[in-house]
Every structure is written in C-alpha cells, then in structure tokens.
C-alpha cells in the first residue's frame, strides 16, 4: 500500500515528507495506457500533488496543472486531504529516451509553460497560484512554486522508475522544508546534506526506499516520525455526476444524441471509466427537464 510518512527533526528546524507512490502511478499508467515519458511526467505530477495535499487541512481539494507548450500537452491532477489523487495527461503516447542509456526524458521536451495550483478550501474562494516552469522536470518546478508562492524554502525529489517493459517499477519522492526558528548553522548543515544526497533515482531503487530516503535526509540527526498515512489513486466520478452534466445540455442536443447516435458514451478524463446512456436514459433526462 502506498503511504506518506511525515517527520520532523528533533531540533524542530526541519520537517520531511517521504512517499511511496508506486501503486498510485502504476494504476494511473494502467488506466491511461501511457507510454514511458508520459508515464513519468504524469507520475511526477501525481506525487507532487500528494505532497501538496498532505500540507492542507479539512476537506480542501488541490488541483495541480503542468501546462507546457510541448508534445505532452497539459497534465492535470486533483487531490484531497485524505490521500486520494487522480489525474491525466493530454498526450499519453510520448516515449522519448536517451539512445545511449535508455533514460526516460521529460524536462527537455516539456517546453515553456507554467506550474499552476488551485486550492479549494470549500469556501467558494479558491486560491490560485501560477509560477513558471523552471526545468520542466516537475520536481524542480514544484520546489520553485513552494519557495515563490508559499514563501517556504523547500527541497523536492520525486521520480518514477520503469522496468524493462516500461511498466512502473517504483515511484515516490520527498519534501524537506525549513521551519521557522531554524538557525543559519542548521540550515547550512541540511543544505550540505541535501547536496550530498544520492540521486532520487538511486534512492528509489533501494530495497526499502522509504527508509533510504529518511536516512539520506536526516543522516545521524535524531528525528521523530509524526504520522504514516495511506495514499491511493482514486477517482470520484460517478454515473450520477455525468447524468447531472447531461441535464445541463439543451433538449435539442440530447435529442440529437438519440437520433444520430442512439445514445451517448461519456468517458471520465481522470480514470477512463466509460458511462453508457441509451435512448431511454436520454429520453428520461429530457422528460425531467420538461
């Protein structure tokens, strides 16, 4: 089961989140049938949103949009504070690798664009923030957002590793944030440790990558695990929700679906679930609109 572990340095100077998001990203790949680069780009976005959602309280919903002018198109993710996340990528078929190493490439082909976050607190006044894409690797772009928009210096590492068949092997990441009151000495010590950390890909390849991430972040410094919470890919779409959407269409459009298509099929963008509405269903909706 996927999870996020929240922790804090005993000194109170820093906190860290580490995530195992393997099942989340694997299910997203399965539902959207993504190729290698699309899988990694979508997966990184889902992990970034899992981190962002873990920072929120109550019943907030968080939308992350990675909008570039590349062949990936838009990447959209929605998460809640209960560990659920869903998402999709417009172009599922991007498959770009280094010829020599087989490394899956994302950043060099993301293009110019923006990292957009929308936090809906349920009050009717969502908070929206937009920052430019810095590298297109998504992790660095997320860190830049946290520093610029939330004024919280943060170190982010996230990635998705694929097997020889381009299926998700492991996915996860971490966030380290400076807390108020941290001394210059403490900040310098952590910056040095982060600079010396192995690459996120190397840590994820460890047998127990969650423990490997924590060890790399804290080293010999004492820390406390605050909580361990489940994570999952979960879509909240339903037939009822799409039926309500059909109710908003003009009667003429609904009648055209009956006359021309003998019904309607609606596919959820976030999870690929198909909902069928036959002629009788559409006639009932028209009747209810009367």
UniProtKB/Swiss-Prot annotation:
Keyword Cytoplasm tagged: yes
GO molecular function, one term: unfolded protein binding
Main location (coarse class): cytoplasm
Subcellular location(s) of the protein: Cytoplasm
Stored Pfam families: HSP33
Keywords in alphabetical order: Chaperone, Cytoplasm, Disulfide bond, Redox-active center, Zinc
Top-level taxon of origin: Bacteria
Family statement drawn from the similarity comment of this UniProt entry: Belongs to the HSP33 family.
Known function: Redox regulated molecular chaperone. Protects both thermally unfolding and oxidatively damaged proteins from irreversible aggregation. Plays an important role in the bacterial defense system toward oxidative stress.
Protein name as annotated: 33 kDa chaperonin
Organism expressing this protein natively: Streptococcus pyogenes serotype M1
Name of the coding gene: hslO
